[in-house]
Amino acid sequence: QEKERQEQERIARMKSLGDILVLTPKEFEELTGKILEANGFHDVQIVGGSGDLGIDIFAWDQFGYKHAVQCKRYAPGNTVGSPTMQTFFGMMFHHQVQKGIFVTTSTFSRPAIDLAIQRDIQLIDGNQLIELLERLQQSSPLNSSLKIADKNQ
């Protein structure tokens, strides 16, 4: 429980892509998992790391569909291209998953976007990631308790 509270505090302090870029790949995957849970996904399984076969997270939506999630913590200007998107789609096929979500701290190239549209892969770029992080912070139990504390002062 203490670990969860510390995690919530760390998330509450994140304000920019710079704060996300200093996370380790595993921490970035864990943050993405929390964002997915806050947006209605359940049974979020973080499988990233070496040997993850190109899938970092599996998560189920409210309709019971399994989603494969790829997380790429790229520096600004390091665009996700179509070869990376093709590899992700290949791994979705390998794992027999129909729905994909690709999350990056940077942006996607036009060919990668076109491929994602063809393959029904949802894209979350750095700007959208910050918006989702802000929503997660607003819905956090820690944030609620901080608001109560502020009102009492």
Placement of each model-derived feature along the sequence:
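Mixed-charge (Asp/Glu-Lys/Arg
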Residues: 1-153
